[in-house]
Regions:
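A gly/proline- and charged-residue-enriched helix-loop-helix capping module
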Residues: 113-134
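N-terminal secretory/targeting leader peptides
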Residues: 3-6, 10-116, 135-136, 140-328
């Protein structure tokens, strides 16, 4: 049986009969910018299913898995949630860096040695510090962080083993000055583009390269146009899960707590699925004739050395407390 919105429902205590006003379901519209089969979309559905199982007809959960299908840009999800058109959505944190520059600290290259370290940071003090800053300057409640994961460079020109191989290449990057600067330091020409614009440019051959987790590269069909894929692991990016603040704050406490619990569960689910998606994407790339370049230790060191100036620049850009959390 579905529980009521009160916190007592979680303890199995009976609830008073709802009034006629309480019988009107709370509408929750979740949205994203990927096919319904992606881990992000499946995680949204998992959240919604959990809420519906708990609250029954007290909630009305609907989904718009891919706003691109409706003619929107990927970055439109920011205002769609902030204005309350969508109740909940996700987007790469890089899209917030113009409004909240401190968020760009997690765009710095090579700051996490592995996935476990990155997850611990985003679930811990670093994630809490970013949440505080985002909520202070937006109309969101941040409820968690999906894993977009480590990113790799793909291109249609040549295999990339060293920074010298990137010299002169045009590469699409997320809307982040830190990311753009990173690729300038390795000799490439970064182009900040929204996803829809970038996909058009890639298909037309107007840009040489892009960077994404392998799963995204395959989801968006980029592997059909890019033969070469280098495992650079240069950025680790998260996707904040944000909720329209006025809606969330107006909800009964029980529903607020239930959503946060549903997000925690969905994040764990999505992260586990992400590992599988990366493995499957690599297999797809190889099966369709793509080449995956695994960098040697020395080749990776060359990239780290090339971008080293960015850490000194970061000390003049970002708050000291954030840098300290990254040991910078």
């Amino acid at each position: 049986m579905a529980g009521g919105f009160g916190t007592a429902a979680h303890a199995g205590q009976s609830q008073p009969a709802p009034t006629s006003a309480a019988k009107r379901p709370i509408r929750i519209l979740m949205g994203g910018y990927g096919p319904a089969t992606t881990g992000f979309s499946l995680a949204l559905k998992r959240m919604g299913d959990r809420l519906e199982a708990q609250f029954g007809d007290l909630v009305d959960v609907k989904y718009v898995y891919n706003i691109l299908d409706l003619g929107y840009r990927a970055d439109d999800i920011l205002w769609l949630v902030e204005d309350g058109v969508l109740t909940l959505g996700y987007q790469s944190s890089s899209y917030l860096t113009d409004r909240i520059p401190d968020v760009g600290v997690v765009d710095l290259p090579f700051i996490f040695p592995d996935t476990a370290t990155a997850r611990a940071a985003m679930d811990g003090a670093l994630g809490r510090a970013l949440t505080t800053r985002i909520e202070a300057q937006t109309n969101y409640r941040i409820t968690g962080y999906f894993e977009n994961g480590f990113r790799h460079v793909s291109n249609h020109v040549r295999p990339i083993h060293t920074p010298a191989d990137m010299k002169g290449m045009t590469i699409r990057v997320l809307p982040s000055k830190v990311q753009a600067r990173t690729f300038e330091l390795v000799g490439a020409t970064p182009k900040i583009m929204d996803l829809s614009e970038a996909l058009e440019a890639i298909k037309a051959g107007r840009i040489d390269a892009q960077e994404n987790p392998f799963a995204n590269t395959v989801t968006y069909g980029v592997h059909a146009f890019h033969r070469f894929h280098s495992m650079t692991n240069h950025f680790y990016i998260s996707r904040p899960i944000f909720v329209h603040r006025p809606s969330f704050d107006a909800w009964p406490t029980g529903l607020q707590e239930a959503l946060r619990e549903a997000v925690r569960d969905a994040v764990a689910f999505q992260r586990d699925l992400h590992i599988k998606e990366e493995e499957e994407a690599m297999a797809t790339i190889k099966k369709q004739g793509g080449e995956i370049v695994e960098l040697t230790r020395d080749e990776l060191k060359a990239f780290v050395a090339a971008v080293n100036p960015i850490y000194g620049e970061a000390r003049g850009q970002f708050s000291r407390d954030l840098l300290a959390l990254l040991n910078l």
